[in-house]
Amino acid sequence: MGEYGKRAEQLFMEGYNCSQAVLLSYSDITGLDDKTAAMLASGFGGGMGRMREVCGAVSGMFIVLGIVAGYSDPSDAQGKKSTYAAIQELASRFRKENGSIICKELLGLSKPEGTYIPAE
């Protein structure tokens, strides 16, 4: 695990959700202050608001990529294309390493929605 992964793990153990931990660990690259980063990523934890859908760590990676290499001009078709390609590549690499980008699959959970606690 690299420096950013170790930092994200430490932040997660301090109580931040997966998305917050990833985004906060890249603050030197994103330029976001901790409060802004934590608030921005707060709803993505637990696989999107504890719905156990897209993994919060994956969402955090996508936010970092968007800040670093995303597009802002809605008419920038090439920027959109390259951003989406980069997101798809990140997702593919994460799937290969972890088997899925879906929170409940990563955690092996099968409980009904809304019954999870963060420690699970």
Give each language-model segment a name.
Residues M1-E14:
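Polybasic, low-complexity association/targeting segments
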Residues E14-Y16, M51-E53:
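Short helix-coil transition sites and intra-membrane helix breaks within transmembrane domains
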Residues S19-D28, V64, S75-E120:
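Amphipathic alpha-helical interface segments
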Residues Y26-G43:
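Acidic-glycine-rich active-site phosphate/pyrophosphate-binding loop
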Residues I29-L32, V68-D73:
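Short helix-capping/linker segments at secondary-structure and domain boundaries
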Residues F44-R52:
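Transmembrane alpha-helix interface/packing and boundary motifs in multi-pass membrane proteins
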Residues R52-F62:
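FAD-binding core of FAD-dependent oxidoreductases
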Residues G60-G70:
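DPxDG-like acidic metal-binding loop motif
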